[in-house]
Amino acid sequence: MASDFIPVTLIYDTGADFLYLDEDYLKLNHLQNAFGRKGKATMGGAGNGEPERIDIFIDPITVHCGAREYQNEITPIIKLRDLLGCYTDGLLGNTHLLMNPLEINFSESYLRQLKGPLLAEQLDNYVKLDARFEDNRIDVKATLQIDDENSLEGWFRMDLGCGSTIILTNETASAFNFMDVPKAYFCTQAGGIGGGSEEVTIRAAKFCMADTLENLVIDYSLNEKGALSSDRPYIGIIGNEIWSLYDIVLDPVSSSVWVKRNENQGTYAQSSVTHMATVDRTDICGGWIVNGLYKGGVAEQAGIEIGDIIVAINNRPVKEITWEEQRKGLELQGETTYTVQKPDGQIVSYTLFIGKQII
């Protein structure tokens, strides 16, 4: 909850600093002026655009999270739902949540701030990663093998605000010969704070961190600006498709990251079968906005474009599809009809033959 006990749904983002609130969440709940004075700031992020001028709240906001209370000094207002959908109201970063050791339990879906480090016997089944805590961020060392000719070892940024597996920076990918590696080109309208993004999806033979994952789907960035471009202190980022396989303890005092494999089998070896990415924006429109497309995929070939609004799938309005269903996956197969609203308001139906992974 934020000040005055207004409920909010926040994502813990290890790639962020403090509290960030979504612009549409504030507008739809008539909270644009609920938290005091405003100012302006310039902010960049993972997107491929220039840093943007955004509104910020310059008066402190008190955040109640469980039994904890945080005083947030400056709160940026960002277009977060364009990226993550209508069930997210904001982000909470490391400044507040990493004041003490933090337990992140994906098995039972909870975060818990600890009063002190866990005892050695409590960490018996955990693996300690090679980690560093610098500039309010967390990096871990890992090894990635693309194929027999391409492998790398180095620091990867821990990014719990990213829903992907691994994304290599543009600079990292440029050092390798991916000419003979099967690939799929992906472009998004909103690829992170700072605008859209361009990526290439490939398969990697192995990823070694706490244990070894095989045949995983990863991306490398083509962005020339932002957090995935070049001149970064890491070779890529690791997102929740990987981290959700583990229960985690973060200890900022000793700069330690401990992980324990859980029972989640994950979807890291599966690539897109619809060949597009959508964002549920039923808070502001009639459906899901197409945010990204794979070049030459079944969605693009059918005529779907970035910015289209999907209003129904197989004649079922997407407004009826719950968040729980979306998270589990719709398991669409074969001939599938998408009813789409184009930017000019025209309603068009497209038939996609769903089944083949993009890579």
Give the location of each predicted region.
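Pepsin/retropepsin-fold aspartyl endopeptidases
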Residues: 1-359
